[in-house]
Amino acid sequence: MKRGEIWWADLPLPTGHRPVVLISRDEAYIHRDFVTVAPVSRRVRAIPAEVPLGPEDGLPRNCAANLDSMTTIPKNLLHRYITGLGFSKMQAVDSAIHFALGLES
């Protein structure tokens, strides 16, 4: 597991089983039992706290990572690797995190 990968996860209800982008730093996946993730949704709102994803990123359809909904979950809720995001897409994720957390300068 490493930052920028997309995995299937069993999130608490009402969210349930869905893909998530791994957000925690790489070392967290080795040493920690809880990790931070961003859910991926088919609902694309085109807002600064979302990152559009799709077939070019290894996903079957157009969707978006929602950084407004980042959450920390037990690592054992991650079940199956889907794909990994490239450098430019992770730059977009970092920008969306800054926006979602109000860290814009």
Give names to the regions the model predicted:
Residues 1-105:
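Conserved functional hotspots at enzyme active or ligand-binding sites that engage polyanionic ligands
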